[in-house]
Structure formats: structure tokens, C-alpha cells
A protein has these predicted regions:
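Short, polar/acidic, helix-capping and beta-turn segments at strand->helix junctions
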Residues: 1-111
Length: 111
């Protein structure tokens, strides 16, 4: 079905990843949007790895952007991080919890 829908077998182990924000382990927040994308994906992939999962286990990704003009960079960074992996995807324009956060990403993985 491609990225319009992915079926998860009943026996799969599910991981629900809370919204990942652009805060690095040292507490810093990158000033630019691309740096924030990298920080968010670093955080999300670390959560996946902690559950012994990889990007190909992602079945659903929801990205919250603060501006529509961020979509192109967001898509490019996502494709760089995920390669050929194409989970079901939703992108929403919102106001984030903290003004300095330019995006947040949550996900569901199944293995």
C-alpha cells in the first residue's frame, strides 16, 4: 500500500515515540531550522535504537512544523535520515510548546 497505509502484524512489538523536540543532549537548541531537524531526528533515532529498532521499523511519522516554508528542508532531511524507508506520514503546521522549537516529530514503530 505504500505510504498511504501500512499494515502491522498482530504479533508485532509496537513502540510509540513521544514528540521529539530539537533539544540536544547538552540542552542546546540549534538556531537554524535544518540544525533543529537534525537534532530531532538524532533524538528520534536514539529512542528507536534504545528499543532495538531501526528506521525501517517506523510505520507512522507525524511532523509538526511552525511554518509552511519549512516543508522542503524538513522533507529533504527526513529522506536523508530514512533513505528508502517511507512510513505513513502526516505534516501539520502548528504553534509549538516553546517558541524556539521550530518543529516536533512523533512516531510509531513496529518490529
Amino acid at each position: 500500500m505504500g505510504t498511504h497505509g501500512l499494515e502491522v502484524p498482530a504479533s508485532a512489538r509496537l513502540l510509540f515515540i513521544s514528540g521529539q523536540i530539537p533539544v540536544r543532549p547538552d540542552g542546546g537548541v540549534p538556531a537554524d531550522f535544518e540544525g533543529q531537524c537534525d537534532a530531532v531526528w538524532d533524538n528520534l533515532l536514539a529512542v528507536l535504537a534504545s528499543a532495538r529498532m531501526r528506521p525501517e521499523h517506523l510505520v507512522k511519522v507525524t511532523t509538526y512544523l511552525t511554518r509552511r516554508d519549512q516543508a522542503e528542508i524538513n522533507g529533504r532531511v527526513r529522506r536523508e535520515r530514512l533513505g528508502e524507508v517511507r512510513p505513513a506520514l502526516t505534516v501539520v503546521i502548528v504553534e509549538t510548546f516553546a517558541a524556539e522549537w521550530l518543529l516536533e516529530i512523533e512516531a510509531i514503530a513496529a518490529a
